[in-house]
């Protein structure tokens, strides 16, 4: 009976140790696959969008960016400003506004509206009040992400 209990304890300790050892690798693989799927889904929705809708979204974002330049003294956006912000470049309704690709580190990450904790747990956040990522003069787009989250390793 003692030998049987010792064997069970040894097996449990081995499985626990193996799980702890494999967790970083499995977690990294899982998060990479999740990011790839999210970006692929977003890309597919953008591809299916009508060209007029795409152009209208970009024009709206450029207009928003122009408004930021004229309101540069305001640091706290109003509720209507936030509502407008979250509606721009939100093609698939998930809050994702695009993605960033860094070929040198084989990294493709979703960019979401805002830098709330819930957003930063799953991807990169765009800082409200900074320019939307559509380019142009006098634009400064700020994104934020964590490198060493327990749930995801971004920019690595």
Which stretches of residues belong to each language-model region?
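Solvent-exposed, non-transmembrane regions of membrane-associated and secreted proteins
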Residues: 3, 7, 13-156
